Amino acid sequence: MIKLKNVSLVFQGGSVAISNLTTIVQEGEFVYLVGHSGSGKSSFLKLLYKEYFATKGEIEVANIDVSKLPKWKIPLLRRKIGIVTQEPQLLENRNTFENIAFALEVMGALPEEIEAKTNTLLDLVELNDSAYK
């Protein structure tokens, strides 16, 4: 679960990227960030990934207070968040199943976990027929 409570991000010079954002994203929930250029979409993600630090407010990811997270734990935090960008990149030498499984492989997941989670995602987006294309 991701929780943001009264989160603001103001850059040096006073430019406001995010102002008093409060929201909850449940585990397994899909969220689409849509908005004009400069509306704070990327800044929101960078706050979650701890690339940016909130000017005020509280951010929790998987019950972890991001503001108190030591630097060495940031990669562990980032593994708990999945992001698909507007221009997804696919590896040409891999089929659909292998492209979906790639992130799990990199994270060191066990083969049976990779198989199960990848099949679940294929079901979710109705791509079972294209898994090995």
Spans of features found by a protein language model:
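ABC ATPase NBD coupling module
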Residues: 66-82
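ABC ATPase nucleotide-binding domain signature
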Residues: 80-81, 85-89, 94
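A short, flexible loop at the N-terminus of ABC-type nucleotide-binding domains that lies
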Residues: 1-4, 9-20, 70-73
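Conserved ABC ATPase "signature" region
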Residues: 64-65, 105, 112-130
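Short coil-to-helix segment of the ABC ATPase nucleotide-binding domain corresponding to the Q-loop/switch region
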Residues: 93-101
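Helix-to-loop junction immediately C-terminal to a conserved catalytic motif
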Residues: 49
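Conserved ABC transporter NBD signature motif
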Residues: 57-65, 77, 117
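The feature captures the beta-strand-to-loop junction immediately N-terminal to the Walker
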Residues: 34-36
